[in-house]
Amino acid sequence: MENNRIKFSNSKVYEINRILNKKPWKYIYKELMPKSLYKRIQTKMDFLQQEAVAKSWDRIIEAYFEGETEKIEVFPKKNLAGRKIIWQYWGTGWEYGKLPDIVKLCYKSADKYKGNYEIIRLDNENMKEYIEFPEFIMEKIENGSMGYTHFSDLLRLALLDAYGGVWLDASILMTGLLSEYSTSAGIEKKGYFMFQRSDSTENKEFWEKLNSDYFSWDKRNKVRVLNSIIFSEKNNKMIHSLLELMLTFWKNESEIPHYFFFQILYNELVGKYMPEEKCKIIDDTLPHILFSRWNKRFSEMELSRITDKTSIHKLTQKGISKGNCIPDSFYDYFNKKFDV
């Protein structure tokens, strides 16, 4: 097999746009252009790059299913058979006093609502007790070519493939028992579950305005799955395929082609190669509703409406801390509820 079959290539127009967004050109390109025009151009550039990334993934996926990619193994190091596990990761360690305020809040909520699951919290040191990655992965982490955010994409897949369970990002807030949610998500049908984009979502413009980098219902958009929350049985076909394809990517690349390249991979797999493995679609705006109200005045009735829809909530730690918590807001309510 020719090596270029599994190499990624960027959109040429996207590359030019990326250069123009750097010094010194950005002072002319960005600052002098009307904001609305600049935004439209960036959106178009993003869709062009998504298409280029999808085509690169297609070449790798085809080589993978034809048996032309190198077999790269990850080794589990524990026997956890029969145990229901919530997996979480925070690279620098889980000493509570050193965690960001939002992570502290989510930490306590997971402990409260774990139900019949046990929580295994991993960091850069103790993860080695559970999973062994190829040396090239660890080298890329050490030399900085793979950031911890994208390493965690690999870690979640490896753990779920080897042991099964539930992956929760450290910024996931729970307001109900996890076991109750796993039943409603229909995990038993496909053996895994992730929230996905739904064409029947209401208030699409609201969500696109809230986070235009992630939310879009444009037909060109290929970012349509949330990987912050993953339920999976051990040895699930989809999770295993995602893991092997991501390992193939990192074996041959040292730079991500798009922040959501994992999501683009999943979109290609379920759209073209493994449509029968697509899990139940549950709207990926649902885990974001609570955070969209985070700094608004707290309402018991509104909270009830939100938690009736989902008990799993995606928060963010960026720019959010007790220091800027607004009194009587939803954030203030949860800080007091969990004594953070």
What label would you give each PLM region?
Residues 1-152, 170-340:
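Glycosyltransferase-associated regions of secretory-pathway enzymes
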Residues 153-163:
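Small-residue hinge/turn detector
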